[in-house]
Amino acid sequence: MSPGIPFLRVFIALSAILLCTRALGAGESGLLLLGGSSLRPPVKRYLPGARRTILFPSSVDFYGLISPLSRPGKGGWKTLADDSLERAALLLATTDPCLIRDSHGVLEMAVLTADSPLLATAVLSKGFLPRFSALFGPELLLAIPARNKVYVFPKLANRLSAMKQTIRDDFLISPAPVSLELFELSAKGLRTVGTLDPDDR
């Protein structure tokens, strides 16, 4: 391994920490976060085809408390989205997923966790699909029960059925829930394809 590689990894990690600290430190930075429609923020947009999953501008204080904003900021939605996706992409680049394999060593799913609420926003970043399509193929299924937890499955021959209750539990116990809706991510973009909520079908 090149002696420069460890330094590069440390540099990237420190950059991510600094960006997250800037976002979470004073509670003044605008972030575009995913959440559930039950949150009822003053300004929101639904993900494509979603009934329960929204994007909303927010600030996050030092302790991680979310405060929805009444407007996306001076630059509008585009500036807020560009800045948030840049931070989310850097967070994604420094987050190692837990890769789950079956008894034959076949990769079944990936689970992403992080302290930052921007983790869920990372599914909208340009780097998310290339990173996981290299593992699961060109079409992915995503479950986002919380802002700091994302499940990634291949679209076909996946373990989603066996994980339904675990994902529901994650949603119910999380202090930062998103929704139980399921999403397909492909070169065509992100779209809602179903739900794990038995009462919302």
Identify the role of each PLM range.
Residues 4-5, 17, 181:
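Serine/proline-rich low-complexity intrinsically disordered segments, especially terminal tails, linkers
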Residues 11-19:
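Bacterial N-terminal signal peptides
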Residues 24-201:
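Contiguous interface-forming segments/domains that mediate binding rather than catalysis
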Residues 1-11:
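Bacterial N-terminal signal peptides that target proteins for export
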